[in-house]
Amino acid sequence: MASIQANKRLTKEYKNIVNNPPPFIIAAPHEDNILEWHYVITGPPSTPYENGQYHGTLTFPSDYPFNPPAIRMITPNGRFKENTRLCLSMSDYHPEAWNPAWSVVTILNGLLSFMTGDEQTTGSVSTSDKDKRTLAKKSKHFNTYSNFKFKNMFPDLRESNIKDIEREAALEAESKGAQQEENKAQKLATEKATSLDDISDPEDRVRIQELIKAEKDKKDQDKNPGENSNIKSLLCLILAIAIFFVGLIMK
């Protein structure tokens, strides 16, 4: 149970966060336990975590702010072990280094700074930037469909995630369909070229080429019916003039 001072301090800090949200960070206490806080860090630009969504917890001692919280990250991220206490200067691993003036925002900014660096500590892991980017892309899906605590703590954010995931899936399907059409067209062109190369008789090859050209011209005509009609009208006019002059000559 939180002490009166801890309750008062954490309530004040939550109000400050609501009124002045820090960049890349969302944080809120559990409605049934003010000592249990949940945070969401959005991966900053120009880092392997860009647009990733990382959920974790801060577990405060009852005598906060005189002692630091335990820090954990739940979402797979490639930097820290999931659901493992992290050894940081602002965590309960180092109470001797703790400053009571530090706040929730100070702690989470420090966590974000450490996360985007390369320093190792207890609870950290080593992975490639490629792995971190892959996990960043999967993070919203994990939080939305596999992270029970996230769903309970951040229902509005979960709904937003669902819309983002559906939109990305639709764009991916559209892109995949366009790529398949392009591949199909390239395959068809390759097959035509191959079939021409297989024809040994020059005259037969010329005839096939003419057929392919005729087919292409027909498609072009179908695409431009207005232009086609104008050409036919012009030809009819020229033919009529020619017949008129032939009639004059014959007289």
Curated annotation (Swiss-Prot):
Domain UBC core: 5-154
EC number of this enzyme: 2.3.2.23
Active site positions: C87
Biased composition regions of type Basic and acidic residues, renumbered to the chain: 173-185
Entry keyword set: ATP-binding, Endoplasmic reticulum, Membrane, Nucleotide-binding, Transferase, Transmembrane, Transmembrane helix, Ubl conjugation pathway
SMART domains, per database record: UBCc
Entry similarity comment: Belongs to the ubiquitin-conjugating enzyme family.
Protein's name in the database: Ubiquitin-conjugating enzyme E2 6
Species this protein is from: Kluyveromyces lactis (strain ATCC 8585 / CBS 2359 / DSM 70799 / NBRC 1267 / NRRL Y-1140 / WM37)
